[in-house]
Curated annotation (Swiss-Prot):
Keywords: Membrane, Transmembrane, Transmembrane helix. This is Uncharacterized protein C3H7.08c. The chain crosses the membrane at residues 19-41. One of its GO terms (cellular component) is membrane. The lineage of its organism: Eukaryota, Fungi, Dikarya, Ascomycota, Taphrinomycotina. Residues 61-75 have a biased composition (Basic and acidic residues). InterPro entries: C3H7.08c. One of its GO terms (biological process) is mitochondrial proton-transporting ATP synthase complex assembly. Residues 57-78 are annotated as: Disordered. It comes from Schizosaccharomyces pombe (strain 972 / ATCC 24843). It comes from the Eukaryota.
């Protein structure tokens, strides 16, 4: 066993003297994978994100408009997105602009039949 150790240590020493830049890289990579293995062994891969969520009790979702004029149930709620101007919660939330932009332009030189087929 001691003979095998001396052979292996001599090979490692010779290799490290011949390729010093690779030896340093090998040491850094060994250390990195060792720390990563230790951390994964300690914490595991099970993360429960639901435990870390904190929902504020007052006005948590500004896009849910609970001030319905008719007093109806959830069908009358306005769920369009709203935001606080500059993140200031003391101001009234504003309605955000629509994400869908429509543009119309005239089409020339195309028959009505083709227009009807592609306008659906």
């Amino acid at each position: 066993m001691s003979i095998m150790r001396s052979i292996m240590s001599n090979r490692l020493v010779r290799w490290s003297r011949e390729y010093p830049e690779l030896f340093i890289t090998w040491c850094v990579m060994t250390y990195t994978f060792g720390v990563a293995g230790y951390m994964l062994g300690q914490r595991g891969l099970l993360v429960q994100h639901e435990d870390q969520v904190r929902i504020p009790s007052k006005n948590a979702h500004p896009w849910e408009d609970t001030k319905s004029s008719s007093g109806k149930s959830d069908e009358s709620l306005d769920y369009s997105y709203k935001y606080y101007p500059r993140g200031d919660r003391s101001k009234e939330p504003r309605k955000a602009p629509s994400a869908i932009q429509y543009s119309t332009f005239p089409v020339k030189g195309v028959s009505e039949e083709v227009l009807e087929r592609f306008s659906k």
